[in-house]
Structures are given as C-alpha cells and as structure tokens.
Curated annotation (Swiss-Prot):
It is found in: Cytoplasm. The keyword Secreted does not apply. Belongs to the ClpX chaperone family. HslU subfamily. ATPase subunit of a proteasome-like degradation complex; this subunit has chaperone activity. The binding of ATP and its subsequent hydrolysis by HslU are essential for unfolding of protein substrates subsequently hydrolyzed by HslV. HslU recognizes the N-terminal part of its protein substrates and unfolds these before they are guided to HslV for hydrolysis. The keyword Chaperone applies. InterPro entries: AAA+_ATPase (IPR003593), ATP-dep_Clp_protease_ClpX (IPR050052), ATPase_AAA_core (IPR003959), Clp_ATPase_C (IPR019489), HslU (IPR004491), P-loop_NTPase (IPR027417). One of its GO terms (biological process) is proteolysis involved in protein catabolic process. CDD domains: RecA-like_HslU (cd19498). It comes from the Bacteria. One of its GO terms (molecular function) is ATP binding. GO terms for cellular component: HslUV protease complex. This is ATP-dependent protease ATPase subunit HslU.
Length: 446
C-alpha cells in the first residue's frame, strides 16, 4: 500500500495529467485516508468507512486517466469497469458481483507476483543448480546411486561452468530439461451469472490432471527464466497467498466505475423494467454500502472498498441517479472543460507527451522532428477550435489533429533518413487551416 502524502500523490499525478486540481486533491485525500485508517486501533478502524467519490466532467478531460495513474500509485488491488457492461441479476449479461470477483483475481495475481519477486534470488540459485546438473550430471556408483561430489575435480568443473553460466557464455547452448507440463485448458461455456460454477469446474479438471513433468529442449537463457518461475512458485504457499489477497481487497481495494451517467434513468422513458439502468444501480447499492461476495478464493467483504464513480452527465445529471446511490457517493468533484492553454501544456509538459512520442517514433527512422513554440500553440488552438465548432471530445482531439498533421511525414519517413523537420506555425497552418476552417470537413475528418 502506498504511503505517499496527499501532496506527493497530487504532484505525481501532475506529471501525467494537466489541470483538474480538485479531482487530484480528492483522490489524493481518499488514498491517504486508506493509510490513515490502518494506523487506528482495530475497534475504531472497523467503524471508519471510505468516503466514495463521484467525478463529473465532459469527455476527454482526464477522469479515466486519473484512475489509470492512481492504480499504479496505489500499490493496492484496483479495477476499472464500465457501468454499461452490467445488467440486473436474473437477466442476460454480467452481474455487478463479478466486479469484486475480478478485483480479487487481480489481487491474487498482484500478491503472487510480489511473493515470487521476494523469493527470486533463492529461486535463481535453485535454477542454476538444476541447469548445472544437466550440464555436468553427478557421478553414479555401480549401483546407480548418485554419489556426493567429494573429489575436487568435478567440483572445479562445476564451478567453471557456473562462472560461464553467470557470464552468459552458455546462453545459446541447447539443453533438454524436465519442466512442469502446462495443464490442459478446459473451456466451459456457461450462461451469464454462472461464472463462479464455471471457474470451480475448470479448477477441478486441472487438479484431476495433476502436475506432470515433461522433457523440453530449449536454449539455456530461455530455460533459466522458466525454471526460476517454477522454483519461485514452489516456494510460495497458495492458501496463504489467497488469504493475503482477500485481506488486501477488503482493506485497500479500489473500484473505479466509469460511464455511470449512462445508467441514469432519463425522463420520459416507459415505466417497464429497466434492467441495464436502474436495475444496475439497485444492484450496486449493496456493494457500495457493504456486503459479502462469494469468490473462488473465498468470501470477500466490501465494507471498506473505495468506490470512485465517474461520468460526463451531458444528457443527465447526478440527481437522476437513484437517491440511495447518490447518498453513497458523498464527495462530488467537478472537472473543468479544457482550454487552448491546457491543450498547449498537454502537448509539452507530461512525461510522455504526444510531441515527445512522435519525436521518438520518427527517430527510429532517423528523422529528427522539432516542434517550435508557435507551432505547438497553433496545434493547440486548432484542436480547441474544432472542439468548439463540432463535438467537444476534450484532449482526445489532439490525437486526431496531430495524426492528421504528421500523416505526410510518417508516410515518407523511411525515405527522409537524416533530415531535420521543423513543425512551426506556418507548417501547421499549411496542413490544418483549411480543414479547421471548413466545419463540414472537420466534422468528418478531425
């Protein structure tokens, strides 16, 4: 779990996301409160529930990007889902309980990779010994029993091979080694809502097959990686990992629900059953409030999982959500539409900005691209103008505009090796102005 302060979390998000300081502050405080809660006495800790967040803002302003970056910072079980993928229990489609099952699966994977990484050094030593046993088989006596290497001669040979192995001199040598056979996958088609039963049947068939060894021929470099994974897996206790993963989900889990505005009931609709809108909201209530969900790894309580919902709310408003769900999302954060100045900063400030990406891509062909300050300003203004005159899709418009601008260079790059191309205001005007000015053309092309 991350121990960063709210200010550190916000400044880390600043490296990738421009503006939206209110949203950054809200998620930074929420993430820090997870750590604060764990410092309390157990009796009080149980009473402190997370304050769930609702992010409201037009498309392309950074709602999903904040969630994506938060997942990397949190070092905690995290899942992002679209609310539109779910239907009410009893109807065809995914149930909302599958959110917690998927979150638990990702937690098991995360905890397992951490445990394997912790045991990697020991696993590498064991893998080294197994490869050396293949290269220099231990001597056997007349009864076929392996003797201990007591003489100095085999030991010296083994040490010489060990040195070569560590220096990479034997990487391309091919050996035959016994590795655990991959269990045969059993695909079971089941109706929606029966995923749990399907998982249990698949696990049962895999366990019936047992763990068999299979001789495989491969290069030492490749074999070493596979043996390290196999030996590291033997050093971890699966049951212990499952319990750690369930604890991590219950205490630190974060669920990001995108497109929550699409499950609002809009005015003037028929009064029939609304299984993919209001029905989904009703099913989300117990999850957000706190309930126990059955997963293949065990029972998971959702009382202390943090839920962050987001939506554009262009044709609906947060008040269109059912009142019970509104009450369970107490923190509201409004994200602002992006300006031309924001677009200019997006093109230059983030660690992997679009301009840096294009420069790196063209550098692979030996073409050097330079963006002048007035060129960047012109690109930002063009993108903003198209957003104003057509649909406002936020920062995603920059992808469209830049792709159009770079199309000619990308196509001819392999024939322009060694050239340096300056993209200034004049170049942008020449390639984009006609499209930007013509509203009908920009509607279909940009």
């Amino acid at each position: 779990m991350s121990e960063m302060t709210p200010r550190e979390i916000a400044s880390e998000l600043d490296r990738f996301i421009i503006g939206q300081d209110k949203a950054k502050r809200a998620v930074a405080i929420a993430l820090r409160n997870r750590w604060r809660r764990m410092q309390l006495d157990e009796a009080l800790r149980h009473e402190v529930t997370p304050k769930n967040i609702l992010m409201i803002g037009p498309t392309g302003v950074g709602k999903t990007e904040i969630a994506r970056r938060l997942a990397k910072l949190a070092n905690a079980p995290f899942i992002k889902v679209e609310a539109t993928k779910f239907t009410e229990v009893g109807y065809v489609g995914k149930e909302v309980d599958s959110i917690i099952r998927d979150l638990t699966d990702s937690a098991v994977k995360m905890v397992r990779s951490q445990a394997i990484e912790k045991n990697r050094y020991r696993a590498e030593e064991m893998a080294e010994e197994r490869i050396l046993d293949v290269l220099i088989p231990p001597a056997k006596n007349n009864w076929g029993v392996t003797e201990s290497a007591s003489s100095s001669e085999p030991s010296a040979a083994r040490q010489a091979f060990r040195k070569k192995l560590r220096e990479g001199q034997l990487d391309d040598k091919e050996i035959e080694i016994e590795l655990a056979a991959t269990p045969m996958g059993v695909e079971i088609m089941a109706p929606p809502g029966m995923e749990e039963m399907t998982n249990q049947l698949q696990s049962m068939f895999q366990n019936l097959a047992g763990q068999k060894q299979k001789a495989r021929k491969m290069k030492i470099k490749e074999a070493f990686k596979l043996i390290v994974e196999e030996e590291a897996a033997k050093l971890v206790n699966p049951e212990e990992l499952k319990q750690q993963a369930i604890d991590a989900v219950e205490q630190h889990g974060i669920v990001f629900i995108d497109e929550v505005d699409k499950i609002c009931k809009r005015g003037g609709q028929s009064s029939g059953p609304d299984v993919s809108r209001e029905g989904v909201q009703r099913d989300l209530l117990p999850l957000v409030e706190g309930c126990t969900v059955s997963t293949k790894h065990g029972m998971v309580k959702t009382d202390h999982i943090l839920f962050i919902a987001s939506g554009a709310f262009q044709v609906s408003s947060p008040s269109d959500l059912i009142p019970e769900l509104q009450g369970r999302l107490p923190i509201r954060v409004e994200l602002q539409a992006l300006t031309a100045e924001d677009f200019e900063r997006i093109l230059t400030e983030p660690n992997a900005s679009l301009t840096k990406q294009y420069q790196a891509l063209m550098a692979t062909e030996g073409v050097s691209i330079n963006f002048s300050q007035d060129g960047i300003r012109k690109i930002a203004e063009s993108a903003w103008r198209v957003n104003e005159t057509t649909e406002n899709i936020g920062a995603r418009r920059l992808h469209t505009v830049l792709e159009r601008l770079m199309e000619e260079i990308s196509y001819d790059a392999s024939e322009r090796q060694g050239e340096t191309i300056l993209i200034d205001a004049e170049y942008v005007k020449q390639h984009l102005d006609e499209l930007v000015a013509d509203e009908d053309l920009s509607r279909f092309i940009l």
